[in-house]
């Protein structure tokens, strides 16, 4: 992988370790659980990742067919611990739309 001027990734050769590092964790809220009915999944990803890289990472990790990727940068939230005020770390949110035949099991039953 090489970096451009604006720290965007360009995948010359897809390295599996780089793809695994792009996707951090699934975001599970009331809104995202409603999106599961429409076969859309929400993940927190690396802020410098592009839609093409996110699509390649999801297809590699979960072995599914991705039909669409929407991304946004949510605003930082203030956080206070005692008298110290700070902000939560910056992240990028990606909403992934899968093909109708595919699904990701976010809640495994044990």
From Swiss-Prot:
<keyword id="KW-0694">RNA-binding</keyword>
<keyword id="KW-0934">Plastid</keyword>
<keyword id="KW-0699">rRNA-binding</keyword>
<dbReference type="GO" id="GO:0009507">
    <property type="term" value="C:chloroplast"/>
</dbReference>
<dbReference type="GO" id="GO:0003735">
    <property type="term" value="F:structural constituent of ribosome"/>
</dbReference>
<dbReference type="GO" id="GO:0005840">
    <property type="term" value="C:ribosome"/>
</dbReference>
<comment type="similarity">
    <text>Belongs to the universal ribosomal protein uL23 family.</text>
</comment>
<protein>
    <recommendedName>
        <fullName>Large ribosomal subunit protein uL23c</fullName>
    </recommendedName>
</protein>
<dbReference type="InterPro" id="IPR013025">
    <property type="entry name" value="Ribosomal_uL23-like"/>
</dbReference>
<dbReference type="InterPro" id="IPR001014">
    <property type="entry name" value="Ribosomal_uL23_CS"/>
</dbReference>
<dbReference type="InterPro" id="IPR012677">
    <property type="entry name" value="Nucleotide-bd_a/b_plait_sf"/>
</dbReference>
<dbReference type="Pfam" id="PF00276">
    <property type="entry name" value="Ribosomal_L23"/>
</dbReference>
<comment type="subunit">
    <text>Part of the 50S ribosomal subunit.</text>
</comment>
<comment type="function">
    <text>Binds to 23S rRNA.</text>
</comment>
<dbReference type="GO" id="GO:0006412">
    <property type="term" value="P:translation"/>
</dbReference>
<dbReference type="GO" id="GO:0019843">
    <property type="term" value="F:rRNA binding"/>
</dbReference>
<keyword id="KW-0150">Chloroplast</keyword>
<keyword id="KW-0689">Ribosomal protein</keyword>
<dbReference type="GO" id="GO:1990904">
    <property type="term" value="C:ribonucleoprotein complex"/>
</dbReference>
<keyword id="KW-0687">Ribonucleoprotein</keyword>
<dbReference type="InterPro" id="IPR012678">
    <property type="entry name" value="Ribosomal_uL23/eL15/eS24_sf"/>
</dbReference>
């Amino acid at each position: 992988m090489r970096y451009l001027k604006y720290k965007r990734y360009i995948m010359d050769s897809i390295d599996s370790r780089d793809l695994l590092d792009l996707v951090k964790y699934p975001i599970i809220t009331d809104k995202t659980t409603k999106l599961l009915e429409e076969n859309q999944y929400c993940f927190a990803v690396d802020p410098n990742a592009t839609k093409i890289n996110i699509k390649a990472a999801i297809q590699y990790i979960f072995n599914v067919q991705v039909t669409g990727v929407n991304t946004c940068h949510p605003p930082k939230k203030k956080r206070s611990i005692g008298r110290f005020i700070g902000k939560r770390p910056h992240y990028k949110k990606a909403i992934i739309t899968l093909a109708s035949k595919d699904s990701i099991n976010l809640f495994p039953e044990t």
